[in-house]
């Protein structure tokens, strides 16, 4: 199975996360592929967006349950992910910000992957599932029966290394950030990535690179490997967390070329509201 076929096989439940199941002939426990997509709003054909080019998701939606009335209880990444993965509202989790650790305030809280682990599943994750600022080690170790795959364990397409700052593969952007990094080293700065990003962090990148050069492509490739390596004697819960379309809007050129810039309509509202609630 290659990464593109893997991506085409995903069934999306559009908000934060997606769930698909297939059944083991041996024990009839469903194998579960759980997919998290960061900041994906319903600009999708199956949600009525006529401009969006989303044929694979649209096709999958024909046989899926599409939710049209979803409510976000707290529009902060860490809080919403903890709420979703525990089934508890933020007033119960006590995670309202981007720094509170979930188990510091709820040591015995039961998470979704932990529930499956407790019921005989092999549980493993890759990519962004929890917000790393809200859990220990960026992954919540108790949730997984197999060590979580971190970003530093990912491999990228031949000829490409880890994206600069975690985001950039374009030659010009990498060159600017490399110059800033050397500048930071010469100054004795400790947090090199912060120094770079404070001075140069483009909101998008259009680079003619393969899918596997960017983080999401590498995550998809690793997910395929994990599926092939699963213990077939046990059911699995595999969580795959993609980072895009959260800012910065970085993607290979072939995806940008699906749209003509002159046909893209700007959002009607482009300034902050005067009296936000």
Task: Describe each PLM feature range.
Residues 2-8, 21-277:
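Formylglycine-dependent sulfatase
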């Amino acid at each position: 199975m290659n990464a593109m076929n893997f991506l085409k096989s995903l069934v999306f439940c559009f908000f934060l996360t997606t769930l698909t199941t297939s059944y083991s002939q041996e024990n009839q426990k469903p194998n579960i592929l759980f997919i998290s997509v960061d900041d994906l709003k319903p600009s999708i054909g199956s949600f009525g967006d006529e401009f969006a080019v989303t044929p694979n998701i649209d096709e999958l939606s024909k046989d899926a349950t599409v939710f049209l009335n979803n409510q976000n209880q707290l529009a902060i990444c860490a809080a919403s992910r903890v709420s979703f993965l525990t089934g508890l509202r933020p007033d119960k989790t006590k995670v309202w910000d981007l720094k509170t650790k979930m188990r510091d305030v709820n040591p015995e809280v039961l998470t979704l992957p932990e529930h499956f682990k407790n019921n005989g599943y092999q549980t493993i994750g890759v990519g962004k599932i929890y917000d790393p600022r809200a859990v220990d080690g960026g992954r919540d170790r108790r949730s997984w029966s197999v060590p979580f795959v971190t970003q530093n364990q990912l491999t990228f397409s031949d000829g490409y290394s880890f994206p600069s700052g975690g985001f950039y593969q374009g030659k010009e952007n990498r060159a600017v950030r490399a110059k800033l990094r050397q500048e930071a080293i010469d100054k004795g700065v400790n947090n090199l990535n912060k120094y770079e990003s404070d001075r140069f962090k483009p909101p998008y990148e259009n680079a003619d690179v393969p899918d596997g050069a960017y983080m999401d492509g590498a995550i998809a490739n690793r997910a395929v490997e994990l599926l092939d390596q699963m213990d077939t004697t046990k059911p699995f819960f595999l969580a795959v967390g993609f980072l895009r379309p959260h800012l910065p809007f970085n993607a290979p050129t072939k995806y940008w070329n699906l749209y003509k810039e002159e046909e893209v309509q700007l959002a009607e509202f482009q300034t902050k509201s005067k009296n936000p609630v």
